[in-house]
Structures are given as C-alpha cells and as structure tokens.
Amino acid sequence: VHLTNEEKTAVIGLWGKVNVEEVGGEALGRLLVVYPWTQRFFESFGDLSSPSAIMGNPKVKAHGKKVLNSFSEGLKNLDNLKGTFAKLSELHCDKLHVDPENFRLLGYILLCVLARHFGKEFTPQVQAAYQKVVAGVATALAHKYH
C-alpha cells in the first residue's frame, strides 16, 4: 500500500486511539448483521439469531478483537501486507473457504465503525487513507485465491 507520510501519520495516529476489543467486536458483529450470509462461517459461535444476539455474543466480540489485532500487525508492515497476511490468506482460502469479497466488506464495515467512534476526527482525508489500507489488506488476504 502506498501512503504518503501524511497519510501514514493519520492512520497510525488514529489507530493508537482504537480500542481493538470494542471496535473489533462491533465491526465483526455489524458484518454478520449487515451481510447475513457471512454467518455461515461462524456457526460454532452459538446464538446469531438476531442483531442483538450477534452484537452481544462474546465469541463474536473475541474474534473481532483477534481480527483487529491482525489488522494492527498489517499497520506495522504496510510495505509487506502480502507477507504479513500470507498464512491468514492460506487459512481462509484453503481451510475455511471464505469468499474473498468478505474481506472487502469487512473493510467497509471497519470504516463505518471508525467513523462512528471518532466522529469529526475521522475526516475525509483520514477516511481516504484508511480506504487505501483496508483495500490493501483485503487484497493481501485474497492473495492465495489467485
């Protein structure tokens, strides 16, 4: 992902304020509510019968945190996203058979959640920088599919 120094500063600066547990749980929960077909990958998580059940599900929250911790690793390695996410790409492709489009959808959801949490701080410029990052991460996660 090519980011200007200004964009890198904006992305890293905002990320330092992110509560990965809260934002991760909300992002994954919203993915499962907004795009219900993604729930099939999480059948072992128990009750996903309603939006409130999904958003309150401790396994959804825990996995959302795990997802954002991986995203944090990507932010530390913006120049090597494919390498950073190679094993996760292989897992999601070969073992879990996740449609790579879901990575893009989660990226869009993450942008919505960041905007909700950070309001005016999530300026159009910050959003543009994050859009590049989530697109790069989605591409890296889809790499093993090609």
Swiss-Prot record:
It comes from Lyroderma lyra. Keywords: Acetylation, Heme, Iron, Metal-binding, Oxygen transport, Phosphoprotein, S-nitrosylation, Transport. One of its GO terms (molecular function) is organic acid binding. The modification N6-acetyllysine is found at residues 59, 82, 144. The modification S-nitrosocysteine is found at residue 93. This is Hemoglobin subunit beta. Involved in oxygen transport from the lung to the various peripheral tissues. PANTHER family: HEMOGLOBIN FAMILY MEMBER, HEMOGLOBIN SUBUNIT BETA. Residues 2-146 form the Globin domain. One of its GO terms (cellular component) is hemoglobin complex. Belongs to the globin family. InterPro entries: Globin (IPR000971), Globin-like_sf (IPR009050), Globin/Proto (IPR012292), Hemoglobin_b (IPR002337), Hemoglobin_oxygen_transport (IPR050056). Disulfide bonds: none annotated. Heme b binds at residues 63, 92. The modification N-acetylvaline is found at residue 1. Heterotetramer of two alpha chains and two beta chains. The modification Phosphoserine is found at residue 44. GO terms for biological process: hydrogen peroxide catabolic process. The keyword Heme applies. The keyword Acetylation applies.
